[in-house]
A protein has these predicted regions:
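Cleavable N-terminal export/targeting peptides
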Residues: 1-24
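Short glycine/proline- and aromatic-enriched beta-strand/turn motifs that initiate or cap beta-hairpins
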Residues: 20-64, 70, 77, 194-204
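Outer-membrane beta-barrel channels and translocator barrels
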Residues: 23, 57-61, 107-112, 166-170
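Residues on the lipid-exposed face of transmembrane beta-strands in outer-membrane beta-barrel proteins
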Residues: 29-33, 50-56, 68-72, 97-105, ...
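Flexible, solvent-exposed loop segments that connect beta-strands
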Residues: 35-42, 71-96, 126-153, 186-190, ...
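Predominantly the C-terminal beta-signal and adjacent terminal strand-loop region
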Residues: 65-79, 147-150, 154-205
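Helix-adjacent hinge/juxtasegments
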Residues: 87-111
Length: 205
C-alpha cells in the first residue's frame, strides 16, 4: 500500500512538472447581458463580473480551463416566474457564481493566440431580501431561490472564443466572447430567455 502511494505521488509530481511550465492563472473582468423576453421583468439587464480561472495544458494544444465569475443581480416574481428586476421593483438581491468547465484548443499565430472553447457552466445563485423591501415578501425570496435550481435552471452549456496577445514571456492579455445556453429555458421551449452573452477582458500569467 505504501509503495502504491509513493508511486501515485511520484506520478502526480511528474505530471505537474510537465504541465507547470504552461500552467496559467487568468483574471477577468466581464460585462454581461442576460436576455429577458418577459415584459413583467426588467429589460435585459447588464451586469459586471469579476473572475479567476486557470488554464491547464492537456496534450498538444488542448487545454482544460475552469473559470469562476462573481456577479450580482436583482430578481422579482411575476407570472409565477423568477425574472430579473430593476432596482425600483426588486424583491431579492442574489450574489452569483458562474463556474465554467470548458475544454479548449489553442491556435498560436506568432505572439497571438485564438482559443475556441466548449463546456458547461454551472450558475450558482442565492437570493436575499433586498435592502428596503418589506419582510412580508420573504416568501417570494424563498420562491426565487427554489426557482434558481428548478428544472435545470442552473445548468448552462457554453461556448467561448478567446483572443490573447503575448506581452512578454508568460504575461498575456486579451479578450473573449462567451455565450451561455440556458438549459432550463430550452426545456420549456424558451431558448432565448435567460441566455447570457459576455465580453471578457482577460489577463493571464
Amino acid at each position: 500500500m505504501k509503495k502504491k502511494t509513493l508511486i501515485f505521488v511520484a506520478f502526480c509530481f511528474f505530471a505537474f512538472s510537465l504541465f507547470s511550465a504552461d500552467f496559467k492563472t487568468v483574471f477577468s473582468l466581464s460585462p454581461q447581458i442576460t436576455i429577458n423576453t418577459d415584459k413583467a421583468g426588467a429589460p435585459s439587464p447588464v451586469k459586471f463580473g469579476v473572475g479567476i480561472g486557470f488554464e491547464l495544458p492537456l496534450f498538444k494544444n488542448m487545454i482544460f480551463a475552469p473559470h469562476l465569475t462573481f456577479s450580482t443581480n436583482y430578481y422579482l416574481v411575476a407570472n409565477n416566474k423568477v425574472l430579473p428586476a430593476e432596482i425600483e421593483n426588486r424583491t431579492a438581491l442574489a450574489p452569483s457564481l458562474m463556474l465554467d468547465i470548458p475544454f479548449g484548443y489553442k491556435i498560436p499565430i506568432k505572439n497571438f493566440y485564438i482559443t475556441p472553447k466548449i463546456g458547461l457552466g454551472t450558475f450558482l445563485r442565492y437570493g436575499f431580501l433586498a435592502n428596503g423591501v418589506s419582510k412580508a415578501e420573504s416568501d417570494l425570496v424563498d420562491f426565487i431561490n427554489k426557482g434558481f435550481y428548478k428544472d435545470l435552471a442552473w445548468l448552462y452549456p457554453m461556448a467561448e472564443i478567446d483572443f490573447d496577445f503575448l506581452i512578454k514571456e508568460k504575461l498575456m492579455a486579451g479578450f473573449g466572447l462567451k455565450y451561455y445556453l440556458p438549459l432550463g429555458s430550452v426545456l420549456k421551449g424558451e431558448t432565448l430567455q435567460n441566455s447570457i452573452f459576455a465580453l471578457q477582458f482577460r489577463f493571464a500569467f
